[in-house]
Amino acid sequence: MKKIFYIISAFLLFAVACEPNNTTDETPVVGATSLTYAVESIADHEAVIVKPEDLEEGAPVVIVLAEDLELRPLSSPVEETPNVNFKAAEHCLIGRYALCVIATSSNDDLAFLTDAKALFPGTSKFYLLSYRNGLSYTAAMQMPDAFAAYGCVSGEIDVNTYKTNNFTKPVSFVHVHATGNAVCKWNGVQNKTVSVPLCVGAIAAVNECVTFKETDLLPREGKGRVSCTHYLGSESGCDVKLYSVEGTNGGWCDEEFEVYNQIWNFFKTH
């Protein structure tokens, strides 16, 4: 398989997200580090693999399903790197994981995920995140044992897909969504897409979560309130988190709330 490798040195300042209890177990990271990029073709899907240059063997892999491979790190001074404008590309330096971002469409057959995982022999754990689509929900229904945890950022699931599939096994899932999102509606669109609370609630029900906890992150001056509903108590050990951001946009990557840090904090506990 043809690969094109790029290594960039970037001086990055990372904002660390605030935990729901207003405390953090990490400190901001400032320094020089390197990312490696590999351009791949996975079952006719374009993909970019991003990872720290010195990543440990067997480190976790986060597979991201996105309709556009906009992956250029904003801090990258190197024009020759792949088109990587996706904040998670930089966050993998904090989390110490490999990131495999695959170009997809909302109606794709997800069988290619098996080929994607085969690129990382010896990997300890795989996680799946869908970005601006609901494919992680589809995967959680069709292949609940394939990933240690699932996540979704600003995505929605088609009504017909929801009706023709079922959540059959407990899964751990995290979803982040702006309540006023104009593209992927929080409450769904009648006969087209399913509401975010319904999707999250369906997983919590299959997990048989017996309790939930609601918390707010630190206030964000001039920005929408960020709250977290955590469904837990399942005998399976699987839990569900829903981060809701008031307003029409997330304002994800500010000092008070860095979305991919929250997602990784969830993933790494599973």
Locations of regions flagged by a protein language model:
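Active-site nucleophile loop of the alpha/beta-hydrolase fold
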Residues: 104, 151-159, 178-182
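Active-site machinery of serine-nucleophile hydrolases
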Residues: 59-62, 67-119, 226-231, 236-245
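Sec-dependent signal peptide recognition
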Residues: 2-9
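Acidic beta-to-alpha connecting loop that harbors the catalytic carboxylate
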Residues: 68, 178-182, 189, 246-249
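C-terminal catalytic histidine-bearing segment of alpha/beta-hydrolase fold enzymes
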Residues: 173-176, 203-270
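A domain-start/cap signature at the N-terminus of enzymes
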Residues: 18-61, 97, 126, 131-151, ...
